[in-house]
């Protein structure tokens, strides 16, 4: 018979103070004076290393979203990356229908990634107001910044090709 027991702080798997968190509505704990003198250095190297690797999805030196691409007559991905094109029923389609199927399948994949990036952004941002350690907060904010770039990049790519992403559904 399993008995319920309340976990004590000493029973927790992670014992690093950098991961100490408060309830989302506990702002009073976040402005305790002593908290400001207790910043861990656990994330400092990761944070400093990321500064050189940030990119701007709106800068054309990375990706030029204004380049035209004919999604009706050209594949966005190499054919070998699209296993659905090898299905016997699909192989009977004319070239234009195969291209449409392949590019819509790729749109679905890009939409799934975009929604995942949005989830990563929301999660990273939500950690900023519950992690008590300022180093952990800065790392979470840094990660939120990076995820926001991913959301912008994928959204711009999808919008430039199809106008908008596919919505989240039961399979996405």
Spell out what each predicted region is.
Residues 134-146:
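Short, glycine/charge-rich beta-strand/loop segments that flank catalytic centers
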Residues 1-125, 129-137, 161-167, 171:
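Terminal targeting/low-complexity segments that flank the catalytic cores of oxidoreductases
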